[in-house]
């Protein structure tokens, strides 16, 4: 729900910059959530639970899956160099440009709070020990390829943003 609120910050700005930022945010959010929900589904299949405790020791069970989840969570938290960081810069920057500084400040504060919860999940994945009913599910090749593509997009959208943003701006101004 918070992520949708961040997108609406760009809409509230009411400018081309804000609308472009919102569309960019949607693109980043799409690939990031694909990765997150794929990992949650995979963990639930292996453990029978989607509770945070089911992620305990994920790094030991599947280091690659833990890495994918970590990158996706850091992107959702708005940490550079991932796409979520640049998307938040765009929508919060649009708010500031439109004199909604208070809205940008609230969004940033909320992002910091959300990051705390994302870091708690990462702590469970990397530092907590798995329970005795250890499970191991090896993801199929198509899962691994899809997740690799998601992570590549999350990184590329954070590092090489100009071509994407230019295309989005052209689309936004066409309406």
Where are these regions (language model features)?
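Alpha-helical transmembrane segments of multi-pass membrane proteins predominantly involved
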Residues: 2-175
